[in-house]
From Swiss-Prot:
Record keywords, A-Z: Acyltransferase, Isoprene biosynthesis, Transferase
Source species of the chain: Methanothermococcus thermolithotrophicus (Methanococcus thermolithotrophicus)
Broadest EC class assigned to this enzyme: transferase
Residue positions of the active site: 85 (acyl-thioester intermediate), 336 (proton acceptor)
CDD domains named in the record: SCP-x_thiolase (cd00829)
Lineage: superkingdom: Archaea
Gene Ontology BP, a term: isoprenoid biosynthetic process
Reactions performed catalytically: 2 acetyl-CoA = acetoacetyl-CoA + CoA
Annotated metabolic or biological route of this protein: Metabolic intermediate biosynthesis; (R)-mevalonate biosynthesis; (R)-mevalonate from acetyl-CoA: step 1/3
Positions bound to CoA: 206-207, 209, 332
Family: Belongs to the thiolase-like superfamily. Thiolase family.
Protein name from the UniProt record: Acetyl-CoA acetyltransferase
Record keyword Repeat present: no
EC number(s) per entry: 2.3.1.9
Length: 392
């Protein structure tokens, strides 16, 4: 298997982008990535695009053909990848495997979602849950994650203040990200006193409905220096995936994402490092409780200790003796354009590890040169992990 490198990244702003169409968004992100990578359209061997539900959100299926056409890249093969909110990272994983296998040399991995054109986005998103045993009975993702939060609070003594601090830190980081949907600060009191959604979660514990797109250019590591300076090349040391039950009630423990534990353990093994070597992480905080759970499941602290870690501010950008988590603002504040999220997470790590000017105001301390991203589909039925390094 060949080593795989990232040589370019581009994204749109995330938010309610009324004037931009579905096709406008992915073309903008793709063009930015191609320019950043210093490649031509003719260099692209294939494209993999993550999209959860173009059919429900904008009435458009067969998006692979649409994107190749509107990007001006026909007849380059383009494949749409779907795994709920993990669609983007699985598109990247497909791209990584195609390059590592030697089948392709230069590949575009992208993600896109246009969520604000549908009347009831919550119902559309619920299609990623178990339709017979969850959605049929009225369960939505806010209610499912609320059950996870309530159980975690009961089992480990997590306080509402500790849970809410996650959102406070996320918004603080997002003020330094020009692409973020919610680039404003908030307070503990504002988070706790926001409109209730599903007890114990308020609106400010939840990620928003977002439009947006993101794209990465990956290539054979031996070819990377043909396009990018050596100090601007970031290497994908591991791309792993694991599955779990789609329905929350079938899990042995709803306070952990077993697929995240399995996928991250595989990633650490492939990269031959321990969790302590990670400098920066982007985790899937679709709801604040999931951020805390992933901090534990990725091995950054013991089970039940995440609340204390968050309350002490250890995940903050300016805290040197712990992994920096979600410097972008995460899904909570940067936005969650479903199919684009997994790519955006890895794009943030790409910027962070090469200490790019794009993240100069939110730059994490890079000591060991490693970053990890965990992208979750549903309530953890699918998890994809990417581990990056600034060293080959």
């Amino acid at each position: 298997m060949r080593d795989v490198a990232i040589i370019g990244y581009g994204q749109t702003k995330f938010g309610e982008l009324w004037e931009d169409s579905f096709r406008d968004l992915i073309v903008e992100a793709g063009v930015k990535a191609i320019k950043d990578a210093n490649v031509d359209g003719g260099d692209i061997d294939a494209m993999y695009i993550g999209n959860m539900s173009g059919g429900l959100f904008v009435g458009q299926e067969h998006i692979a053909s649409l994107i190749a056409d509107h990007a001006g890249l026909n007849p380059v093969p383009c494949t749409r990848v779907e795994a709920a909110c993990a669609s983007g990272s699985l598109a990247l994983r497909s791209a990584v495997l195609s390059v590592a296998s030697g089948h392709h040399d230069v590949v575009l991995a992208g993600g896109v979602e246009k969520m604000t054109d549908v009347e009831d986005a919550t119902a559309a998103i619920a299609s990623a849950s178990d339709q017979e045993w969850e959605a049929f009975f009225g369960a939505t993702f806010p209610s499912l994650y609320a059950m996870m939060a309530r159980r975690y609070m009961y089992q480990y003594g997590l306080t509402i203040e500790e849970l809410s601090m996650w959102s406070v830190i996320a918004h603080e980081n997002a003020t330094k990200n020009k692409y973020a949907q919610f680039g404003f600060k908030t307070t503990l009191e504002q988070v706790m006193n926001a409109s209730p959604v599903a007890d114990p979660l308020t609106l400010m514990h939840c990620s928003p409905v977002s439009d947006g797109a993101s794209a990465l250019i990956v290539c054979d590591a031996d070819k990377a220096e043909e396009f990018a300076p050596k100090d601007e090349i970031i290497y994908i040391k591991a791309s792993t995936q694991a599955s779990d039950t789609i329905a929350l009630h079938d899990r042995e423990d709803m306070t952990t994402l077993n697929a995240a534990k399995v996928a991250s353990e595989k990633a650490y093994k492939l990269a031959k490092i321990a969790p302590e070597k990670i400098d920066v992480a982007e985790v899937h905080d679709c709801f604040a409780i999931n951020g805390l759970i992933l901090v534990e499941d990725l091995g950054f602290c013991k089970k039940g200790d995440a609340g204390k870690v968050i309350d002490e501010g250890k995940i903050r950008i300016d805290y040197d003796d712990f992994v920096t988590v979600n410097p972008s603002g995460g899904l909570k504040a940067a936005g969650h354009a479903l199919g684009a999220t997994g790519i955006r997470q890895v794009g943030e790590l790409y910027w962070q590890l090469k200490q790019d000017k794009e993240c100069k105001d939110r730059q994490a301390t890079i000591k060991n040169g490693y970053g990890i991203a965990a992208n979750v589909g549903g309530t953890g039925g699918t998890v994809c992990v990417h581990l990056l390094s600034d060293k080959r």
